[in-house]
A protein has these predicted regions:
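Basic, helix-initiating cap at the start of DNA-binding domains
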Residues: 2-53, 57-62, 78-79
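Amphipathic alpha-helical packing segments from all-alpha helical-bundle domains
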Residues: 118-125, 138-171, 198-209
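Amphipathic alpha-helical linker/stalk segments
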Residues: 23-24, 45-54, 61, 82-112
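Amphipathic C-terminal alpha-helical segment
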Residues: 170-193, 206-211
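Short hydrophobic/aromatic patch on the recognition helix
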Residues: 64-74
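Residues in the recognition helix of alpha-helical DNA-binding motifs
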Residues: 73-74, 83, 199
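Amphipathic alpha-helical segments used for helix-helix packing
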Residues: 85, 96-97, 117-142, 183-184
Length: 211
C-alpha cells in the first residue's frame, strides 16, 4: 500500500482523503450557532439597557426569532442563564483582578475600593438583574454564591490583615466592600462615584481601627 501523497506504481495518484477539518462547514450548523448567539446577545443587551427581568418573549423579539426557536436552543431560561454565565464569567471576573496590591494598609484599602468601584459600575445592570431573578433560579443562586465567595477571597488577598480581625469586623469589612452597599450609596442615597468611594473608604478604615 502506498503512502498518501505519493504516486502508486501505475503513476496514478492516490485518492486524497480530506480530514473533517478540511470539509466545508455545515450550513445548518452555522445557522444554528448564529441563532443561538443572537439569543444570548439579546438577553445581555436587554439587561444592559435596564430590563432586569427579561422574559423569553422579550428575548425572542430582540433576537428576531420566534419563541419556539429560543426553547429549541435552550430547554428553559435556566439553561440560557447558565450558558451566559459560561460566556461572561472570564470577562467579569477579570474586572476584579490585578491592581496595585502593594503599599500600606490604607493605600491598599483605597486601591481595592477603586478596583471594585470600576467593576461595580460596569456590572451594575447584570448584578441587579441577577438579584432580581435569583429567588426563582437555582442556577443564578449558585453562581451568585460562587461569585460572593470569590470576591471575599479576593478582598482577603488585597487586605490580608482581615485574618486578624474579630469575626464581627470581618463581616463588617465584607459588607462595606459589597455591591449591595455600593448600590445603596449610588442608587438610594444618590451619591456620586467619588463620594461613594469615600464613604466605603471611611467604613473600612473604621473596621480596621485606622485613626
Amino acid at each position: 500500500m502506498t503512502k498518501a501523497g505519493k504516486r502508486s506504481i501505475g503513476n496514478k495518484p492516490d485518492a486524497v482523503i480530506h480530514s473533517p477539518e478540511e470539509k466545508k462547514p455545515d450550513g445548518r450548523l452555522l445557522r444554528t450557532e448564529r441563532s443561538r448567539q443572537l439569543i444570548i446577545d439579546a438577553l445581555c443587551d436587554l439587561v444592559q439597557e435596564g430590563v432586569l427581568v427579561p422574559t423569553a418573549q422579550t428575548v425572542a423579539e430582540r433576537a428576531g426569532v420566534g419563541i419556539r426557536t429560543v426553547f429549541r436552543h435552550f430547554a428553559d431560561m435556566e439553561a440560557l442563564f447558565a450558558t451566559i454565565d459560561i460566556q461572561l464569567r472570564e470577562s467579569y471576573e477579570g474586572l476584579y483582578l490585578g491592581g496595585d496590591r502593594d503599599g500600606s494598609l490604607e493605600e491598599r484599602i483605597r486601591h481595592a475600593i477603586e478596583r471594585r468601584a470600576a467593576a461595580y459600575e460596569k456590572l451594575s445592570s447584570l448584578m441587579l438583574s441577577t438579584r432580581a431573578l435569583m429567588w426563582r433560579s437555582p442556577v443564578l443562586q449558585k453562581n451568585y454564591a460562587r461569585n460572593q465567595r470569590g470576591l471575599r477571597k479576593d478582598l482577603a488577598d488585597w487586605l490580608p490583615e482581615i485574618a486578624a480581625l474579630p469575626a464581627v469586623r470581618k463581616e463588617a469589612v465584607d459588607a462595606a466592600a459589597s455591591f449591595e452597599t455600593w448600590d445603596r450609596l449610588r442608587s438610594q442615597q444618590g451619591l456620586s462615584t467619588r463620594a461613594s468611594m469615600e464613604v466605603v473608604h471611611e467604613m473600612l478604615r473604621l473596621a480596621f481601627g485606622i485613626g
